[in-house]
């Protein structure tokens, strides 16, 4: 059954995608994108426990958006942390000083508007230059690499591609207690899904 107002929402989200991409292509690379200290500060700021509320919108479909809540914990990992060594090996990098820092993220998610089994998981990632190395992707257990940039001290953008799909993500802090996230999933140049998150620090 169609969700009231869904088509209007999809149109608005598509416009926001176009505006975001236009702004990104027309503006010069922000100097923050090459600053290791700024990247480390962003990861340190992310550390802690978060309550996440999110929606998944399937584009070009009358399907109602999926809704979920998650309990998330982010642990900051300094460069010498032992958790980063297996990640370096998985990506065929030298384990010694492979990353400037990283993080371990654990989560437990529950869908609120459909009957599905709760999901639990964890992932480890590290950053080096303008690349983010992860032990798994959004929809794969294989190690993946994302490109990232900081367009402001509180805003990070990432691009990831694997298995014929691409993922554009933006993470933005709103003050000290909240952050927003948006992920756009595309295949063959066609946007398929938008995931939007509001996360509150506990």
Swiss-Prot record:
Annotated Pfam families: CpeS
Disruption phenotype: No visible phenotype; a triple cpcS/cpcU/cpcV deletion mutant has decreased amounts of allophycocyanin beta subunit (ApcB) compared to a double cpcS/cpcU deletion mutant. The lyase activity is therefore unsure.
Keywords: Lyase
Keyword Lyase in annotation: yes
Superkingdom of the source species: Bacteria
Molecular function GO terms recorded: lyase activity
Family classification: Belongs to the CpcS/CpeS biliprotein lyase family.
Primary role: Covalently attaches a chromophore to Cys residue(s) of phycobiliproteins.
Protein name as it appears in the record: Putative chromophore lyase CpcV
Organism field: Picosynechococcus sp. (strain ATCC 27264 / PCC 7002 / PR-6)
Organism ancestry: Bacteria, Bacillati, Cyanobacteriota, Cyanophyceae, Oscillatoriophycideae
Gene designation: cpcV
């Amino acid at each position: 059954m169609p969700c009231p107002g869904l088509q209007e929402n999809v149109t608005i989200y598509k416009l926001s995608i176009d505006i975001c991409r236009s702004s990104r292509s027309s503006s010069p690379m922000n100097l923050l994108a090459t600053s290791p200290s700024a990247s480390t500060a962003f990861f340190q700021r992310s550390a802690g426990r978060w309550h996440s509320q999110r929606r998944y919108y399937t584009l070009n479909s009358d399907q109602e958006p999926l809704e979920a809540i998650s309990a998330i914990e982010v642990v900051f990992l300094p460069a010498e942390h032992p958790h980063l060594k297996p990640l370096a090996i998985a990506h065929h990098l030298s384990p010694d000083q492979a990353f400037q820092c990283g993080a371990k993220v654990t989560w437990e998610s529950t869908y609120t508007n459909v009957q599905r089994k709760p999901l639990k998981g964890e992932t480890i990632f590290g950053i080096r230059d303008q690349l983010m190395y992860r032990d798994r992707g959004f929809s794969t257990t294989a190690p993946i690499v994302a490109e990232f940039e900081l367009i402001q001290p509180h805003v990070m953008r990432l691009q990831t591609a694997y298995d014929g799909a691409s993922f554009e993500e933006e993470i933005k802090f709103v003050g000290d207690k909240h952050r927003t996230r948006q992920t756009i999933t595309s295949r063959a140049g066609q946007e398929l899904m938008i995931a939007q998150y509001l996360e509150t620090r506990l």
